[in-house]
Amino acid sequence: MQETENDILKRVRKIEIKTRGLSNEIFAGKYHTAFRGRGMSFSEVREYRAGDDVRDIDWNVTARSRTPHIKVYEEERELTMMLLVDVSGSRMFGTTDRLKKNLQTEIAAVLAFSAAQNNDKVGCIFFSDRVEKFIPPKKGRSHILMIIRELIGFRPESAGTKLSEPVRFLTNVNKKRCTTFILSDFMDSTGDKSALDDALKIAGSKHDLVGIRVYDPRETELPDVGIVELKDAESGRKVWVDTSSRAVRDHYAASWQRRSGEIEATLKHNRIDTAMTVSYTHL
């Protein structure tokens, strides 16, 4: 039986309470780790002292003054977290008691409330094969609850996925460095790998990107249940397959593993800070 929106709202309320003690747990821990050593802004240039990091040397000033100088940075007091949430058709997949959409909402809630604990701003970008909705970063519990309500009730215009679109949008609207969590199955229906690589490379030079993969176990392999009709949630394409055939099941599993490997390679190539694979289990 699928959960109702009231069920999810009840869980969100429980999550809000739970996150008060999650600072060293799974998602809150990842949040703190992602921000550790981040959010540094330029403060001043001063002469080099023994023990200073040579990577901070300002070579232009050093050349002009003929004395080693370094750039000094200070930690910014106000940090920003962005959530890039995949709202394409594939998020409505679910073979157990919950949809992928519901799990995404829970993860987003934990991350957002963790940011609130640190008095940080939280913003959100909903995307399919386009940017569906942009919620500018703000502070406060009421703002986070608004984001979660939007996640629960939002109806996208498109069912497809184009990951490069929200990443480009992030680069354009967020000039200040932030940590960004991308919540998606990372199955790009356009197959435009070069566009995604380019977008991630540019965004990664300005922001800290964290990939969180959300999937259902039944997406990885087919059960042996005879002849069934499969439908692509994003393209709407339907096909009949004989799941009693070992060859068919093996081909399906191999295809998923291949695509999963390509996703991991893309994230690694673009130096995504953390690529978490989240199986479809209860938090």
Where are these regions (language model features)?
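An amphipathic, basic-hydrophobic helix/alpha-beta surface used to engage anionic
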Residues: 1-132
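DG-centered beta-turn motif at the end of beta-strands
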Residues: 59, 85-88, 124, 170, ...
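SAM-dependent methyltransferase
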Residues: 222-261
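Conserved small/polar residues in nucleotide/adenosyl-binding loops
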Residues: 281-282
